[in-house]
Amino acid sequence: MGREAFEAVLRGSKKVPDSRRNRKLRDKVIFGTAFHTPARGRLEVLRDALIVVAGDGRITEVIAQGSGDHDAARARAAEQGRLVELGAGEVLLPGLVDLHIHAPQWPQLGKALDVPLEVWLRKHTFPLEARYADVAFARTIYDDLVSGLVANGTTTAVYFATIHMEASLALAEICRARGQRAFVGKVAMDDPDQCPPFYRDENAATALDEMRRFIEAVRAIAPGGDALVHPIITPRFIPSCTDELLAALGRLAAETGCLVQTHCSESDWEKSFVEQRFGRSDAAVLAGFGLLRQHTVLAHSNFVSDDDLDLIRARGAAVAHCPLSNAYFAEAVFPLREALDRNVRVGLGTDISGGHSPSLLDGCRHALMAGRMRQGGVDAGLPRDRRGVADARITVAEAFWLATAGGGEALGLDVGKFAAGCKFDALRIDVEADGSNVRVWPDLDEPEDVFQKIVLNAGRANIRQVWVDGVCVGGTAGDAGQRASVSR
């Protein structure tokens, strides 16, 4: 299929080179076709729209094709040298929001996923994370991680780092330098009965002091309410922390206004451990310690009850749905449909490296698959009416919303959609890129079909440019793609 055929589907524009990587050139007008899901399950196709981006990286206006000011606005932008036109075969998507990443586990991506969780943690994960006491080692890994995730379209990332102050701060610095929007958490884990002796905080007081200093340090390198990089309070999970530490971190969250992230009811073991220790569920315990707050991110949450979901919603917290790693280590599927029906905030997480893919587009695919298998059931030996959960599956538009606007809502950020007031975090997708698996047939495909094919088949090779805060920070176009000027 040629580029002309693609344009017959999208009615797109001729190709004009893209903008430079220059933070002074946020002020721009993008012309082309964009897809986004501004509300759960609702796909909106913006054909030949103008997206006006101000110098602060925020969208000030989206001008639809056919509106009275469209042609005049396009002409003005061209005269001012502000117009960036998408080329033939190119469309715009919102940037992807990954709610759950274990940054230090990047070197073991794709390793040891065929062993039990206990082996995975004790033999592979904890020894690897302990190595981040070496800051030079940490910087090498973290720089590769952040650049790799940006290339895969992750414009906002929520990171677990390690217990090490300097290495965790290095991750925050690298995110800022690479231009990725990020929440970075120095991990807190002090319980000697559950944490290995070579990898834990000395005690609750030390962990609290270092968390406080970490928050101050991150806010110093990225000052201001509109900063790209933020600290996030990160108790690893309830079993790894003493009561003293959990209570102290809850007070610190209230004092500093920092967001919180942790694991919640991921597995049978975790659920049982917490219930035996406290007589309550993970969600209830976190609430009791002051850690279940507005925009707290709860990774997994597979074994939550209806009461837990209601509590999570009432506190304004959110779930990071990690369908791939759930399949490997949780041995359960998150009740996504039930959470959405209860208006719980939910987004997607890759859960590197419990999940082996760094792509949140893959995360959309895994969420779709998990929903379908949960609805259909997996035990063919059972009667059909006993195999699955009714209405559990989700649509492609819902999956993409989870990866974009849903993730933004989870964090309280104006990202994930193209609307006035939102940050311009976006992906320039080229369906005709070398090696592309996206195939479009103008006699068969409507624009909505093209969207689905991109979500289900596009990959890193298709991501020509990545914008964060109105600035191009990555993509396959590279330096050559940055040198070309905007149209006049």
Predicted regions and their residues:
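N-terminal metal-binding scaffold of metallo-dependent hydrolase/deaminase domains
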Residues: 1-79
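Alpha-helical scaffold segments that flank or form the walls of functional sites
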Residues: 109-180, 209-225
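His/Asp/Glu-enriched, well-ordered alpha-helical/loop segment
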Residues: 34, 288-295, 336-438
